[in-house]
């Protein structure tokens, strides 16, 4: 499986950070939000950010922007679609419904949630849709934090999960770990434990 284009839905701190990190690796990204104005402002924040999110300001050309109503067709060509919207299950479920109706067959769909169990995120998906669905929990700031948690579900195509892990390690420079669906995933659990020690 090759990842040659990515769509990110949600252009807040995490969506923007993931977009910047992908474009640093020369992966074309489309950043979608409720309005093109919101995603355009996010692209401008990426360009001006301190510390810099981009390794080279010219990399910004790898990021296109749009909105989830007029520009959603880009999902049909994407190899990986990342959901990075607000942590509300009802909103995430609506986004997934729209993604799975429009994505190309076999495209990976992932959530950047930091705490919602994958069982809840995927409860309304078909078994076939679950094969291509996982959590990709990037840490903020994405460019500077090496850890990436990939949380799998019981229906995943494990070869696809392994391909995604290798892409994130080799192309994005992440220390990717594959986790089971446990509360808070691994990174948050270790963080809470460390604060208590």
Regions found by a protein language model. Name each.
Residues 28-78, 88-90, 94:
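Conserved N-terminal Rossmann-fold NAD(P) cofactor-binding segment
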Residues 22, 43-54, 82, 100-103, ...:
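Structural signal for hydrophobic packing residues in well-ordered secondary-structure cores
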Residues 19-24, 58-80, 163-173, 179-184:
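Amphipathic alpha-helical segments at domain termini/boundaries
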């Amino acid at each position: 499986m090759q990842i040659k284009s990515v769509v990110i839905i949600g252009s807040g701190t995490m969506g923007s950070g993931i977009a910047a990190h992908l474009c640093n690796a020369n992966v074309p990204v489309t950043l979608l939000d409720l309005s093109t104005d919101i995603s355009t402002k996010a692209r401008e924040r990426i360009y001006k950010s301190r510390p810099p999110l981009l390794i080279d300001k010219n990399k910004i050309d790898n990021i296109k922007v749009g909105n989830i109503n007029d520009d959603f067709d880009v999902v049909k060509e994407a190899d990986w679609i990342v959901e990075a919207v607000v942590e509300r299950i009802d909103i995430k479920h609506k986004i997934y419904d729209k993604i799975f109706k429009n994505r190309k067959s076999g495209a990976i769909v992932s959530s950047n949630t930091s705490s919602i169990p994958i069982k809840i995120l995927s409860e309304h998906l078909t078994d076939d849709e679950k094969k291509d669905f996982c959590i990709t929990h990037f840490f903020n700031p994405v460019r500077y934090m090496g850890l990436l948690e990939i949380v799998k579900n019981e229906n995943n195509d494990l070869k696809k999960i392994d391909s995604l892990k290798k892409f994130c390690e080799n192309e994005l420079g992440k220390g990717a770990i594959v986790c089971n669906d446990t509360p808070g995933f691994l990174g948050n659990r270790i963080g809470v434990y460390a604060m208590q020690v």
